[in-house]
Amino acid sequence: LMGLEQYTVPGKPVLDLGCGSGILSIAALVLGASAAAAVDIDPKAVDVAYENAALNGIGRDRYTVRAGNVLTDGALVAELARQKYALVLANIVADVIIPLSARAGEFLDTDGVFLCSGIIDTRAGEVEAALERNGLAVFERREQNGWVALAARAAR
């Protein structure tokens, strides 16, 4: 949840890549995001995320969860990219964030933030390099107990 409060823009949509239980996108909706789309490669995550959203009073009119892989499914990417997001979240391991960094820019609106976390500190440099290589400039790095969160925007 580190950085979520700071980068959720009230009235703007959020995309959660690798949503798992949906905690981050649901929290963003509670913080005022207009809508959230969430994706996970595990189909079971869809039901879990919808259940957690319902427990927080969030309906499917504002919350869409899909099973799929944005690294391999071009149709899913095209569908998600029809909307541009003020905040794109990825709380997953470095081995997924690194290839995901090539896609993140497709989803961001002009001043949108790609907030990636779940990065073990020994891999943070690799993730930063991948973000930069893919046109994203890291402007904030937070570290806690050996874990790193990076916030990046499209490089200008």
Show which residues each predicted segment covers:
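Conserved SAM/SAH cofactor-binding pocket of Class I
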Residues: 1-70
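Short beta->alpha hinge that forms the Motif I/post-I loop of the SAM-binding pocket
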Residues: 40-44, 92, 119
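Conserved short alpha-helix immediately C-terminal to the canonical SAM/SAH-binding motif I
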Residues: 44-48, 96, 123
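A short acidic, Gly/Pro-enriched loop at the edge of an enzyme's catalytic core
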Residues: 75-87
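A short SAM/SAH-binding and catalytic strip from SAM-dependent methyltransferases
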Residues: 86-98
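A short glycine-rich, Lys/Arg-flanked "PGG" loop and its adjoining helix->strand segment in the class I
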Residues: 98-113
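ADP-ribose/adenylate-binding Rossmann-like module
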Residues: 111-124
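Core SAM-dependent methyltransferase catalytic element
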Residues: 137-156
